[in-house]
Regions:
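Alpha-helical segments in soluble extracytoplasmic regions
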Residues: 26-98, 102, 110, 117, ...
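N-terminal hydrophobic targeting signals that begin at the initiator methionine
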Residues: 1-2
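Sec-dependent N-terminal signal peptides
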Residues: 5-14
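Sec-dependent signal peptide cleavage junction
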Residues: 18-25
Length: 158
């Protein structure tokens, strides 16, 4: 009888120590399977925009063309595919929703920049840049929240 109880206790401890964590499993799938499917689109879109913004700015026409023909279509495709990712656990669903919101805001900011350039409205361009920076901040917040969730569930990102 004592052997059975000892065995049950040992197995219980092992199960608790090595048991499956559904959030951990969900995070591993999200990071290793789902995000790599969409990340290249985001990178290509942001790189296209960066190639005509800031220190790389040359003309409104060049910026308009690059955003309209490359950055926005790729970012729209990215946002659509990002929304299609459906994490299994509420914890990751909440963090993923932050990313979707940030991506949608960034996509809208790209559209707003196009409209402002088309109208040649300096005030709208300034507002669009503020919106783009706000979306970037939301993406950084998502990254921090994702890292925190990973830490909480013993997922190491290399």
């Amino acid at each position: 009888m004592k052997v059975k109880i000892s065995l049950i206790i040992i197995l219980s401890i092992l199960f608790l120590q090595f048991g499956t964590d559904p959030v951990q499993k969900d995070l591993l799938n999200y990071i290793n399977v789902e995000l790599p499917k969409v990340a290249p689109l985001e990178t290509e879109a942001v790189n296209a925009y960066s190639s005509v913004a800031g220190a790389n700015y040359t003309t409104d026409e060049a910026m308009y063309k690059k955003i309209k023909e490359e950055a926005l279509p790729k970012y729209s495709k990215f946002t659509s595919k990002l929304k299609a990712i459906k994490p299994a656990t509420p914890e990751l669903q909440s963090v993923h929703a932050e990313y979707v919101k940030a991506a949608q805001d960034q996509e809208e900011a790209f559209k707003f920049i196009l409209d402002a350039i088309k109208k040649q409205d300096a005030k709208e361009i300034q507002t669009a840049n503020v919106d783009l920076n706000a979306a970037s901040t939301l993406i950084n917040n998502w990254k921090a929240d994702l890292l925190e969730l990973c830490k909480k569930h013993n997922v190491v990102i290399e």
